[in-house]
C-alpha cells in the first residue's frame, strides 16, 4: 500500500469524478491504445479495473482526510499497463492536491 498526503481533504466522489473524466483519455494518449478501464465507487473506495484483461482490481484508492491510501494489485506490479496507470494517477493526484503538493507518507 502507498499512502500519500495531498494536503487537502477530498472525498471518494471527487476522486471518482476526476478519474472518470481524465484517466482513460490520458491512457489512450500515452499508450496509443484503445484499452479502457472501468472506474467505480465500491464500499467507500474508488476501484480501477479492466475485466477483459485482468482479474480483479488494478488499483483501489481510499481517501482518509488529507491522505489517499492506494492499494495496487500485487498480481500486476510489473505490468506495463498498470505502470502507465500509476504514472497517470500520480499526475492526477498532483492536480487534485493543494498547490500541486503531494507528499509520500508510506510506500510498502
Language model region names:
Residues 1-47:
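Negatively charged, low-complexity tracts enriched in Asp/Glu with abundant Ser/Thr
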Residues 5, 36-38, 60-62, 67-71, ...:
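Ser/Thr- (and often Asn-) enriched beta-sheet segments in non-cytosolic proteins
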Residues 11, 44-56, 60-63:
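Polar/charged, Gly/Pro-rich intrinsically disordered segments
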Residues 26, 36, 56-58, 92:
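Intrinsic disorder/low-structure terminal segments
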Residues 26-32, 53-54, 97-101:
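Short secondary-structure junctions
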Residues 55-83:
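Intrinsically disordered, low-complexity regulatory segments enriched in Ser/Thr/Pro
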Residues 78-108:
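A conserved amphipathic terminal alpha-helix motif
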Amino acid at each position: 500500500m502507498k499512502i500519500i498526503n495531498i494536503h487537502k481533504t477530498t472525498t471518494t466522489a471527487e476522486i471518482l469524478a476526476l478519474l472518470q473524466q481524465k484517466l482513460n483519455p490520458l491512457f489512450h494518449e500515452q499508450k496509443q491504445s484503445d484499452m479502457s478501464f472501468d472506474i467505480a465507487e465500491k464500499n467507500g473506495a474508488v476501484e480501477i479495473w479492466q475485466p477483459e484483461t485482468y482479474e480483479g482490481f488494478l488499483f483501489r484508492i481510499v481517501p482518509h482526510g488529507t491522505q489517499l491510501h492506494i492499494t495496487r494489485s500485487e498480481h500486476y506490479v510489473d505490468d506495463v499497463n498498470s505502470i502507465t496507470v500509476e504514472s497517470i494517477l500520480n499526475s492526477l493526484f498532483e492536480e487534485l492536491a493543494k498547490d500541486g503538493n503531494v507528499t509520500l507518507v508510506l510506500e510498502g
